[in-house]
Amino acid sequence: MKMVEIKCPSCGGKLKVEDSQTKLITCEYCGSQFLLDDEKVQHITNYNIYQTTPSGKDQGNGAKIALGAGLACAGVLLAAFILSSGSGSSSGPRTAPPSIPAYTRPAGYLGKEGEAGEEVREEETAPKADSPLFHAMTWEMFQKEPSEISPEDLAGVRYLKVETSLETDRVWYSFDDPYSEKEPVVQTASFGAMDWEPQDAAAFTGLVKLDLGSGLSRVRTLKGLKELKGITAGNVEISGIKDMLDDPAQITELQLKGITSMEGIASFENLERLTVRDYPDTNLKQLVPLKSLNYLSLEDTVDSDSIISTDKDKIRVKDYSAISVMCGLKSLYLNSDIIKDIGFIKGLPALEDLTLEDTAVISLASLSEVPALRSLTLLGNNKVQDFGPVGTAPGLTSLSIDKMTSQPDPDLSSLSGLERLEIKGFMSISSIRGLSSLKELSIHNCNVDQADALSSLTGVERLTFYSVWNSQGNLRNLDFLKGMTGLKYADFTGNLDGTGWSGYNYLVEVYGDVSSIFNHQGLEELYLDNGKFEINFDKIKENPSLRVLGLRNMELHKNYYVESYGGMTSVWYDDVKLGEHMDILSRFPNLEELYLDSNELADLNFAAGLKNLKRLGLKDNYITDLSPLKQAEFLEYLDIRDNPVGEVGDVGNGVEILQ
């Protein structure tokens, strides 16, 4: 007698017999119910398992995870007791298994990622791709009927990502290699409720990177995808992914979540990039043999301080010391409130990029002992006692700090090679004065009493600036930008989702005139969306360099009078409507993109002079007549949602219109 462990074909859980008379069995983990059906062939007894429709559930849902008799006969995912006569063979015809309904989502249901529903076949060859979503996406890709699509067409798709939800299926695809040095062009498509068999993805035989999320759990084989290098999956064990492939050594990137074991990871001997959400072990020793690993991302989603967490008993990494011997690591991302010390990064010879998010790290002293470090990101980490060591990493070219503590700001003045800087929660920006190598600068949630320090940053080309304050209240002007002679991009839009540090205003509010920014020579993109300030329109001069302008939802004022006393500030002003000053747009003759949402505009007469306009956003206004746009011969995109527009007319020819 040979005994084989009984497992649920849906989730792999343990099955138990509920009723020996009706032969009803139930999965102890997911609750799925099955019936045993005997097939007697000489001395062999096979048990075919069919899932019954749970009481009160839609019949379609019951069929979703039905498995055919071929599954049981293969003896791969099922449980069985096999009684043999010793010959190891059988004779006589076998009873054909009953047909199992194909997986069909009920009307209006698009399927949940990770549901079992794929009938497993004995043969290695994947079934012919034939699901409605497959046909929809291939039409989007090739504009051909199914019969006209060749294997060569399908092989041309190099990247594929599919997400399904209750209302929408979304597909991302590219004909470019995502691992090449050239940035791939990724296209997207959205569809309504459609059936989708993730196994159909194997029809794209030239895939280099595949992201099916939890849908990969319904894929039996990826054999034949010889060029596949990257896989993103959820709720699929590593050993299962290994068995899908011709050779796991071909894979260089894995992005995983919802796994319970690292078993099989050693088979991916050429793995270069690994991302794991909720690593299923207490240490990282299994990763040490992966000598090609150069990127590691580990996210622990458990909140140790939560009093309502249901994950208190979850297996978590408590020992990160194995990282100290991963000498090939170039990039490391860690998110875990278990991490209190980062001594394991000391001396990593190749580490160039380090991100620490929401850790419990107390000291950053180890940063000075990472010789190759070029990029550092610190997000959260509210237990840090001293940010000073950040300034002792002279090789840094990129730095992002979200300082969520009252500890002193680090002195950044010695980081002479810094090219990109993002700071949040700083009490002073004086230490950035003189950072002549800076090209990108983002300042949020900071005290800007020393805003004049920005005038010394002549090399900065991109500036993002919002949610700031000073000891006198709000800013009075933006004149400190005049010294930033290299500025090409300025974004004062703000953080509209309301997330950020402390309770400060998330937008830019200036108690005075900001017209000087419109005259900034060399400025190509300017975003002042949702701003509250004055614009002295008479001071705005012609600026031929400006190509993109965002003026969404403007709250304009004039005649500011500000009075402060005893820590209280009172402000008086008069309101101004942007629509009364649209003639200023003629001073930007090379404008290509203009966004004017939510400004109570009633006409488009201003557009007649914008000959180079390609994109125009007018959402939520009072526009009724689009005829002035006929003169915008290069117009490609028009957003007129939430406007009482009647006929689009000739404007619609060749223009993408959101209406």
Indicate residue ranges for each PLM-predicted region.
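Hydrophobic anchor residues at the C-terminal helix/turn of individual leucine-rich repeat
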Residues: A201, V219-L225, M244-L245, I265-A266, ...
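Short Cys/His-rich micro-motifs in 6-15 aa windows
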Residues: G31-V41
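Concave beta-strand-loop units of leucine-rich repeat
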Residues: Y159-P198, G206-R218, E227-G240, Q250-S261, ...
